[in-house]
Amino acid sequence: MYFGVGQSALSAVFLLTAALAGSGCATARALTAPPPGPARLAVVTWNMNAGRGDLPGLVRDIEEGRLVGAPAGDVVLLLQEAVQEAASELHELAAVRGWSAFFAPVHHDGARRRGNAIVSSRPLHGARAILLPRERQPRNAVTGAIAIDDQELFVVSTHLENRVSWWKAGFASDDARGRQAEALLRELPTEMPGIVGGDFNTWLGPGESAWRLFQRRFDDTPTAETPTFSGGLVLDHVFVDLPEGWDATTRVIPDRYRSDHHPVLTLVYGSNASSRAATR
């Protein structure tokens, strides 16, 4: 996420507005303890702060089990603000592991061309970019499909508008992100399970239309309460719609790995894992 001046003041205003808007939030499930055994899939969404983040360090910690307790069966990284100038390093990181990578540039900030990327330990099929309605800057999502235990899942990395319209009907408005969320959802399969991660810039909290729209479509998503950015803001999310009998847990990684955002880690457990009681 990129900011101009006055970030602290803006954060305070947005947190107040979020508290007022929270009564309209979508229902998310509350989870108990995770099932025993290693996860079948580890999914991380992370805004790399215009390429400044230490991606090799993050991948190393995932592979060595420091973040997931034990090495996960497979890994999918959903990255935002990767930069075209370092795309070769991204592809090299994937190539030496036999992984797949897809990067689509979207915005040039005068120094670097930023974009979204997917890196997957599973073969990534049908990778493409999806252009979103433009507000202040160009925005897109990247998507593709992977297969886990003979089950196909779509995966998406996206980055929504980071500004709001002020004082519409007396409140800050999230119309721009709402329009982008609607456009992205129209492009995604409706009869196929999938995972969407990204920097949704949900400054106004759970009552934001983008948050509610994705929570409704991806109703296996664990509750998101831990801040991912300064000022106590929850901007980054992993939304999941899983096959019958699968389950997931989500947590925010304490280390930012030189970015200004915390990575968000979702562990997906296949149908052979013990299910957990959950309330919705």
PLM feature spans:
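Active-site environment of divalent metal-dependent phosphoester hydrolases
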Residues: G51-G53, Q84-A87, D109-A111, R163-W166, ...
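Active-site beta-strand/loop signature of hydrolases that rely on acidic residues for catalysis
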Residues: R40-M48, I62-L90, V119, G144, ...
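Structured beta-strand-rich core segments of catalytic domains in phosphoester-bond hydrolases
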Residues: L78-E161, W246-A248, V252-R256
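Active-site-proximal segments of metal-dependent phosphoesterases and phosphodiesterases across multiple
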Residues: H159-L184, T202-R216
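Soluble or luminal CAZymes and related metallo-dependent hydrolases
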Residues: D54-L58, E85, R136-P138, S173-A183, ...
